[in-house]
Structures are given as structure tokens and as C-alpha cells.
Amino acid sequence: MPLICLEGASGVGKSTTAHEIAKLTNAYIIPEVNFLFERPSVESNTWYLERQVERWMMAQDKLKTYDTVILDGDIFHPFSYNWCFNFKIFNQNLELIANFYRKALKEYKIGFPEKYFYLYSDKETIRERKDNDLTRKRRNFEKHLGIVDSYTKYYNSLNEFLPQYVHFVEANKVEENVKMILGNLNSTTNLTTPYSTEFLEEIINWLANNKA
């Protein structure tokens, strides 16, 4: 029973695609942190990281009863997102984030999904979809659109360490996204364990030595 993650720019169609997969198959969706949890008035610099651990635990529980569990948004999101802003936001530098994940991984409180599916499209198409979607308000949309190239670069880098670990899906139509994802759901990768400390260290080293 695979645990997969859908990633991509805000507005590209991750949640819509995930919900369509759930309609067609026995799949459960773990929403992103901002949809699952109410943010406290005073937030520690590890609050968001701790919620990612909770998402992982939820996913492990749902894998007992569902054929597929979909992480709508990466549980390692603090790495990619903060890197795009040179680790100068949220009072979270690379060392803090890295040490948090090192500890959580060694304690089996968090791990890597079996495969990523990264949805992408050109910026104008993403902007049009956002304007046509009246169901959600997307805060800082233009700011997030501005980091798309760096964001994509990060997920490309994961394939340098684990070839074919991230499957890139050109997000033209939802039904095509679904077909592509379901067709590659059980394809193998070189990830031998979700708790790979070696893979984590490769990611941390790459982040430390590459600029967004």
C-alpha cells in the first residue's frame, strides 16, 4: 500500500488531483498543515515541523485501511520552502530544520514517502487557474509563484540521489494527471527504507551547498 506525495506550485492542481484519485480509488488524503491545524497565536519555531510529524503518523495509521495514502504537500516542506528564501524566514535556519528531521527520522517519527509526483505548468496557466478558483483564497500567491523555478530545482535534485524518485507530471488536465499518477503508482525507486538517514544527509548537504 503506497504512501505518495503530491507537490508543485500553489494553484497547479495538487488538491484537485488528489481528490479525484480518492474518488476513483481507495485512497486517503492527508491535507497540508494549514488545512489540518489551527495555528496558535504564539508559534514556536518548531511548531510547523512538529505538525509534519503528526501528518506522518496520520499517514501510517491510514495505511492500515487504505490502498493508497496521499500527502497533499511534502512533509519535508520546510527544507524546500525555506531554501527558496535562503533560510531567512520563520526563524528557521538550515541547522535547526536539519537537526529536527535527523532526530525525528532516527526515532521513526517521520520518514520519506515511497514516491513524489511533482505537478508543473507554466506560470500564466497557474495564474489563470488561481483566478478561476473561487473556492480558495491563496495568500501570497504572487510571492509563491516567484519561487517556482527554485522550488522545481529542489525536487529535481532529489532525482540526483534517487533516480526516478520524483515523477514530474505536466499538469494540463486533471484526468491526465490522475492517469499518469495511477499508471506510475507502483513503479519502483531506489529508496530502500523510508527512514534513510543517508538520503536525508544528501539532501541537507545539497541545500547547504546550493543557492536558490
Where in the sequence are the language-model features?
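Hydrophobic anchor at the beta1->P-loop junction of P-loop NTPases
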Residues: 6
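Conserved substrate/cofactor phosphate-moiety recognition/catalytic segment
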Residues: 19-64
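A glycine- and Lys/Arg-enriched "phosphate-lid" helix/loop adjacent to the NTP-binding pocket
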Residues: 81, 85-154
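NTP-dependent small-molecule kinase module
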Residues: 134-137, 142-212
